[in-house]
C-alpha cells in the first residue's frame, strides 16, 4: 500500500504544476475577457481593422488553446534543472503579466498605442523565455512557438489599428 501511495504522490507531484498553471492561465484569460467585454461591444467594432482580422469567434478559441500551452510550458519549466528553473519561471511570470496587461491597455483603457508598447514587450519576454529554455526545457519552447506566432500576428493587428484609427 505504501508503494502505491508513493507512486500516486510522485505522479501528482509531476502533474500538479502543469494542471495548476493551466487552470491559472485559463482563469487569467477569463478575467481579461471580462475586462474586455464592454470595449468589445461598444468601442472595438467602430475601429478600422486589418482585412486579415479573423472572425471574432477565433480569438477565444485560439487564446484558450494558447493558455493551455502556456500552462504546460510552466509545468515543463517547473521541472527543469535547479540552475535553470528560477530564470525560466521568472520570464514565464513576466510574459504572463504582460499578456494580461495587453488586454487591459488595448481594450479596457481603449489605447491601441499602449497595447502596442505592451505587445512588443510581451514578444521580447516570450523570445527571452524561449532562448533561456533552449537547453533546459525544450517542451516549453515547443509550447511557445504557436504562442509566439499568434503574438506576432496580434502585434500586426494592433499596429494596423494604431495606424488607421
What do these predicted regions represent?
Residues 48-61:
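Short aromatic-rich membrane-water interface segments that cap or initiate transmembrane helices
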Residues 63-74, 95-98, 122:
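Core segments of transmembrane alpha-helices
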Residues 106-112, 127-141:
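Membrane-helix boundary connector in multi-pass membrane proteins
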Residues 132, 136-165:
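Terminal transmembrane helical module of multi-pass membrane proteins
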Amino acid at each position: 500500500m505504501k508503494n502505491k501511495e508513493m507512486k500516486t504522490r510522485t505522479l501528482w507531484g509531476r502533474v500538479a504544476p502543469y494542471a495548476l498553471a493551466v487552470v491559472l492561465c485559463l482563469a487569467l484569460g477569463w478575467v481579461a475577457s471580462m475586462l474586455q467585454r464592454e470595449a468589445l461591444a461598444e468601442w472595438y467594432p467602430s475601429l478600422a481593422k486589418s482585412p486579415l482580422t479573423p472572425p471574432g469567434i477565433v480569438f477565444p478559441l485560439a487564446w484558450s488553446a494558447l493558455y493551455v500551452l502556456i500552462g504546460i510550458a510552466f509545468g515543463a519549466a517547473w521541472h527543469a534543472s535547479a540552475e535553470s528553473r528560477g530564470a525560466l519561471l521568472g520570464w514565464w511570470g513576466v510574459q504572463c503579466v504582460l499578456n494580461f496587461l495587453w488586454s487591459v491597455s488595448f481594450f479596457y483603457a481603449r489605447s491601441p498605442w499602449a497595447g502596442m508598447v505592451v505587445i512588443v514587450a510581451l514578444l521580447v519576454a516570450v523570445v527571452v523565455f524561449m532562448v533561456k529554455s533552449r537547453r533546459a526545457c525544450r517542451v516549453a519552447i515547443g509550447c511557445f512557438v504557436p504562442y509566439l506566432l499568434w503574438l506576432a500576428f496580434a502585434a500586426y493587428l494592433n499596429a494596423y489599428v494604431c495606424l488607421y484609427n
